[in-house]
Amino acid sequence: DGIAPREIWLEAGKHGFLGYHVPEQYGGGGVDDYRFGAVMQEEVSDTGVIGSANGMTLHNDIVLPYYLSLANDDQKARWLPKMVTGEYITAIAITEPNAGSDMAGTKTTAVKKGDTYVVNGSKTFITNGINSDLVLTVCRTDPEAGHRGFSLIVLERGMKGFERGRNLDKLGMHAQDTAELFFD
């Protein structure tokens, strides 16, 4: 069905393949060396499960570093341990239907309402979009600020107004989910 079962993520977490560079205090391996990920990617490429492995590479090497550098201590304590075990799968949502990955054309907005943000818009071609529990979402928060008017907003599975569209058909990488996301 074009989606790697969550059990694969849990198994990867159990064997230390997820969050290896997350500090040990959050359950990670504490490895601060890019070569570990490179070796892992090479080994996985020989297994024939490259679709699910690419989702894990995105999780480990693209998304997790944002949480490590930008999340506050409470967020790290809440999210990082589950990212390491595979209980939480992550995604990053940049690409939009009418703008592609050109951030200057981002139409998705986030407007501050009290202590939270209300996000409106849509994203497409989001790796791990169906399975993800946490989606780091690029939003325009200040239209007057040009390139400085963007923010990364974390959207959690089950949040009101956050819907997943279909799992997109692709020519390859059939075991990797790629989704449309809608925010209203």
Segments the model singles out, each with a brief description of its role:
Residues D1-K14:
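Short secondary-structure junction/hinge motifs that connect adjacent elements
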Residues M83, N98-S101, F125-N128, D142-E144, ...:
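Short Gly/Pro-enriched turn/cap motifs at secondary-structure boundaries
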Residues K14-I89, T127-L134, G146:
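Internal helix-loop-helix
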